[in-house]
Amino acid sequence: MVARLLELDPGLTLSRSWTTRDRRPGESPEAYTFVDRDTFRARIAAGGFLEWTEFPGTGHLYGTPVPEATDGDLLLEIELDGAHQVKRVDPEAVLILVTAPSRAAQEQRLRGRGDDEESIARRLEVGDHEMEQGTRMADHVVVNDDVDRAAGEVADIIRWRRADPGGA
């Protein structure tokens, strides 16, 4: 969906997250900046992340580097903990929760990307918590039941917020 959203809105810049996990089979090396724990921890110590989190149960670290100046809006793909951190740094940040249409669809997507059973179970458990907390915290919730429709809805929200920054 993010790739489609970037096609629809050239004013968006996608922030490339860092992670300590290994690259999945078939995953593009450009999907993340893949680093070891020591490199990640050094970046934390240097204040180099806008937000970061350790994913529960896996020990993998994920983080969004402090953004360089950009002319457009910055798009972050982050977890709930990261969203809390971003809101503390920038209370005006717009949070859009994008969800799968159902828990079964979420599980199918995780299986489709090649995750192992243990990882799928952890993701689903975390996903249940994030759905509950995220819907309370998010400014907008979009159900990703169709990539083009969901990307279009997110693009519409962004256009609306640009036109009326204080809108809710």
Q: Residue ranges of each PLM-predicted region?
A:
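ATP-dependent small-molecule kinase phosphotransfer cores
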Residues: 17-74, 81
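Conserved nucleotide-binding/hydrolysis micro-motifs of P-loop NTPases
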Residues: 19-22, 80-82, 100-105, 147-148
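NTP-dependent small-molecule kinase module
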Residues: 91, 108-115, 132-168
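Conserved phosphate-donor/acceptor-positioning beta-strand/loop module used by diverse small-molecule
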Residues: 75-79, 88-111
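A conserved segment at the C-terminal end of the G1
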Residues: 1-10
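Phosphate- and divalent-cation-binding pockets in alpha/beta enzyme and binding domains
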Residues: 1, 85, 105, 153
